[in-house]
């Protein structure tokens, strides 16, 4: 039996953990603190699949009719 990957499903946008350098850039761009980012739980199936841990920030790249692609950021919480 093969394991199904959530990330391979067409309805699931691309998720990836960002580096500290990219995080600093995002926070300064939006003039916010890390804790002000929207949240995603560490128990979320996609969080588990990408190996996210509490405190990581995940970039979600979604298709957009107006922008082509749009990035969203989520702070991983317990």
Curated annotation (Swiss-Prot):
The record's listing under PROSITE patterns reads: RNA_POL_H_23KD
Give GO cellular component annotations, separated by semicolons: cytoplasm; DNA-directed RNA polymerase complex
- Which reactions is this enzyme annotated as catalysing? RNA(n) + a ribonucleoside 5'-triphosphate = RNA(n+1) + diphosphate
Q: Name one GO molecular function term.
A: DNA binding
Task: Tell me the Pfam families matching this sequence.
Answer: RNA_pol_Rpb5_C
* Matches recorded under InterPro entries: Arch_Rpo5/euc_Rpb5, RNA_pol_subH/Rpb5_C, RNA_pol_subH/Rpb5_CS, RPB5-like_sf
Instruction: Give the GO terms filed under biological process for this record.
Output: DNA-templated transcription
Reported EC number(s) for this entry are 2.7.7.6
Q: What class of enzyme is it?
A: transferase
Keywords (alphabetical) are: Cytoplasm, DNA-directed RNA polymerase, Nucleotidyltransferase, Transcription, Transferase
Task: Tell me the compartments it is located in.
Answer: Cytoplasm
Query: What family does the entry list?
Result: Belongs to the archaeal Rpo5/eukaryotic RPB5 RNA polymerase subunit family.
Q: How does it assemble?
A: Part of the RNA polymerase complex.
What is this protein's function per UniProt? DNA-dependent RNA polymerase (RNAP) catalyzes the transcription of DNA into RNA using the four ribonucleoside triphosphates as substrates.
What name does this protein carry?
A: DNA-directed RNA polymerase subunit Rpo5
- Say which species the protein is native to: Methanosarcina acetivorans (strain ATCC 35395 / DSM 2834 / JCM 12185 / C2A)
